[in-house]
Amino acid sequence: MAKEDNIEMQGTILETLPNTMFRVELENGHVVIAHISGKMRKNYIRILTGDKVTVQLTPYDLSKGRIVFRSR
């Protein structure tokens, strides 16, 4: 799958789940389950409830995503 196929959306962390998974509410109101991308995990980027994040979604499964950026 090419990087161009991903859909990027802004969202807010609703709750923290086990295994670095998060429940994220997107701008359009949908709630998805997202995990942290590898580079964020490698650099120990901490994500807390209420943080604004950028989530990448795949067109194949819009209920799961990957957190790629945490806004300040």
From Swiss-Prot:
Coiled coil, from the record: none
Principal cellular location given in the protein's record: cytoplasm
SMART domains in UniProt: S1
RNA-binding is among the record's keywords: yes
Compartment list: Cytoplasm
InterPro entries: NA-bd_OB-fold (IPR012340), RNA-binding_domain_S1_IF1 (IPR006196), S1_domain (IPR003029), TIF_IF1 (IPR004368)
Domain of life: Bacteria
Function: One of the essential components for the initiation of protein synthesis. Stabilizes the binding of IF-2 and IF-3 on the 30S subunit to which N-formylmethionyl-tRNA(fMet) subsequently binds. Helps modulate mRNA selection, yielding the 30S pre-initiation complex (PIC). Upon addition of the 50S ribosomal subunit IF-1, IF-2 and IF-3 are released leaving the mature 70S translation initiation complex.
Protein name stated in the entry: Translation initiation factor IF-1
Name of the gene: infA
